Amino acid sequence: MREEHYRSYSAVFPILLREGAQGQEVLLHLRQNTGYMDGSWDFAGSGHVDENETARQAAARECREELGIAVAPADVEFLHLCHRVSGGDGRTYYDLCFLIRKYTGTPTVMEPEKNAGLRWFPVSALPENISSAVEAMLPCCLRGIPYSEYFNDKPVKL
């Protein structure tokens, strides 16, 4: 008899960083019309891993589809994994953050129905209306912390 296991989801969060006038900057997009955290600044190019696709391939695909930039999967560098149990629907997610250093093209809004704009923000001066993903995972990515857990919209303290 085969035992069924719960279903989990995987999402990728490309992290695009650059040096700006005020130090390191991160590229964020303003969510709209998605039904999830609309009106919040979120990691630009984030999305789900599709069937028969690796996480690196998904990050490269999402960058192409949502930002119009070309990224080779070999240039996608692992930064952080967050095991997240969503407070809203109880879904379990494995959120993978990847550093994107090398890409071709200029980040552009490719899905204006879901993305109200792109903007580079100094990591030391993020807007107040950031997504829970940015709030939870960006500090880990910047500090070199490879793993975290998030349960019902709160970080798990060990």
Task: Give the residues covered by each predicted segment.
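Charged phosphate-binding loop/patch that engages nucleotide di/tri-phosphates or the phosphate backbone
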Residues: 139-158
